[in-house]
């Protein structure tokens, strides 16, 4: 087989090199390697000085790079050699070459194969016929006839078939016009990502047929004109003009529309437009039409900078027919950090505001994709929060303003939290103290404001200081940590208290002693080796009694009774109550650890408080705690294998012999797209909980193909895969389903279909039901009917996995010729 390097090929200097001469073949290989790494040919020539010339400077050295430079500079690309070969090569040097039989032309990342080819050197023009194939950076074109200027990549291809590397999309056309290296126009074209088989009767599940498709590799965007989208051989959507991605890069344009039908808004059509402003800025504008309510406009703007980032959202609906008024909402999120000579500074803003008290009920599902009884409190409390932080060394400052918007329901009013206008906090935490001591000082000033019609108590300015000193004694086998705290609080009220005073003060010390031991032994259970620990712990705390019944409550509540709070000094969270404790908490935990990795396979724990005197300090309306023995906390967690998980917490009252609170959860996740979880939650009436509840929660995602023996993870060309997915929340107390999300997913090689039924509780007496459909054409677009089921599944189903996770772009050498 003949091989003819043309004038664009590497030029080998004829003079003798400075060092011992290299054989021509080795020299050519070295020059080619340098050229591929981006070294200009002019530099290569200079690197070969004459024998008589002294070297003026050291030869160029290669620089390390994290990746191979695929896009060469124009000057380098112009000097790339052209190589041709075939069964028979004829022609004139520097003019033209004719290759017959297995003809091949190579230049850079472009390779042309054909039965016959003619190459004109002066015009850099290749004409090929018969089984023509172009491979350019992994993108392949096949056809009958080609006329191409190789470097400029301009010309045409007749009767072409094509396949693109990044999306695995392919199709055919009567003609492909190459406009330049990055742009082309495909005429009478088809486009699909369905995997082609060798069967003569093969037809793709979906295909786009268009009069023209413009392909832009700079923007990675395809634009189809005068087209129609076919699914299963049936035209489903006429497309006068549409853009679609040629890679995973973001692009401006219309996003797939969303069509919905629910019991509140009626039929809903939303058409989002995505604006890719810059690599670090984008916006989404979504006009929406609702048959029962009118039109709405939603906007979202995001930005990201090295020192700050944020998000702005706004929604507006003029004359909502549901409430006969304008509806609006906006949100601002901003986070920033700055380095200054005086220390680090941070800024945070989180503001949410809506037009009226019914907004959470009328818009919560459309905006967030989720609503429910457990979510309502958060949706009804909208923050207006701004914080400014400063830190340097051992000191830090915080300045904060927080103003809530509380959305009230006349049938279920809630007490709004207090606004903090403003709050100023200083903390001092020395890093090194003599004698192994740890110490800190925290001082806070807050002005609390709220509507007295709801709170029933005066507003106030509160100042407090808390100083503490501890001395940890640490050893591998255990620890002892004595701690002393001093709390000082002062109030100034805007109205007199019941005793007629407008001020109040309180100063209290607290002493605590925390201690624990750690025993270890080798153990073996169920044929498996473990390192077993036994960790007894004792925690004693004492705070003297001080009458605090007249002090209002601004930011304080009873701590939840759990393994985290049982070993703390105060039974209350916040600064308005300090419990008069004289108690000892005893507990023990045992763990089974993997001796090689340290992973926890099992954990069992028990803890109980022993009270030596009554706790007289309570929340308003509360009763003193006089039980000498508290409820017993029992906890267990088992992760015997990564596939299985079990967790349980029980609050047991030894006096009544009954459990006041029980939580049991289990999970089985043997592989991708396979997970089942179940939970049981029971809560009796306690001093903290006024409404009992008992619920069962089940969630799952599982391929139905497993039922008939098809246990793969991905679909094949022989058929797709069915998945069942959902979550059920059932109230045993009310004997009804509270929340329901159930659906089916079907994954083919090139499309995904989803149907989801969602029924979520809006209030104690009402719910909203939605039926959602979606078909996703892989590598092209996604069409939804009934809002977005993906959002609902991700937010409601524990450990839900998208059927098509993002993957890295394949190398162009996966389709190398």
Curated annotation (Swiss-Prot):
InterPro entries: LipoPS_assembly_LptD, LptD, LptD_2, LptD_C. Pfam families: LptD, LptD_2. GO terms for biological process: Gram-negative-bacterium-type cell outer membrane assembly; lipopolysaccharide transport. Residues 1-45 form the signal peptide. It comes from the Bacteria. It is found in: Cell outer membrane. GO terms for cellular component: cell outer membrane; transporter complex. Keywords: Cell outer membrane, Membrane, Signal. Component of the lipopolysaccharide transport and assembly complex. Interacts with LptE and LptA. HAMAP family: LPS_assembly_LptD. Together with LptE, is involved in the assembly of lipopolysaccharide (LPS) at the surface of the outer membrane. Belongs to the LptD family. PANTHER family: LPS-ASSEMBLY PROTEIN, LPS-ASSEMBLY PROTEIN LPTD. This is LPS-assembly protein LptD. The lineage of its organism: Bacteria, Pseudomonadati, Pseudomonadota, Betaproteobacteria, Burkholderiales. The gene is lptD.
